[in-house]
Amino acid sequence: MTMDNVFITGATGGLGRRVIKYLVNNGSAVTALSRSEGNSKLIWDLGARPVMADLFSSEELTECTKGIGVIMHLATSIPRKAIPNKPSDWQMNDRIRIEGTKTLLKAARSNQIKYLIQPSITYVYGNRHGETVNSES
């Protein structure tokens, strides 16, 4: 897998900003999804090319991922509560992680993009009340 042309969602989050810096510093051309003019400026300042599009629009994502080799889906909406344990706390994050992923997969198929990278996120296991989480949890 080459990282020549990378498309990133979640570009202005804590992880996204660091990934963009790393990729740009290592010679990758990075295109990043933006939801606002302010975010677009931040993305430019990081060395990437911002594109305004809707994460939930197959048509828009298919258009802005033409010529891309790798998609990195880093977008999340982690609740800001100390212990987010109600399903409603996770509604937007679930939409981003489920519907957004499906939309990106459609765009990837349409543009013959072979790689979509999506990291895991905090709180996948919920509140374990002090119980240790491991690979068998």
Report the location of each language-model feature:
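N-terminal Rossmann NAD(P)H-binding glycine-rich loop of SDR-like oxidoreductase domains
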Residues: N5-N26
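SDR active-site strand-loop-helix element
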Residues: T9, L33, I71-S77, L116-T122
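Glycine/Thr-rich phosphate-binding loops of Rossmann-like dinucleotide-binding domains
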Residues: G16, K81-A82, G126-N127
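Conserved glycine-rich Rossmann-like NAD(P)H-binding loop of the short-chain dehydrogenase/reductase
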Residues: S28-R35
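NAD(P)H-binding glycine-rich loop region in Rossmannoid oxidoreductase-like domains
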Residues: R35-E99, A107
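Conserved Rossmann-fold NAD(P)-dependent oxidoreductase catalytic core, especially the SDR/UDP-sugar
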Residues: S88-S137
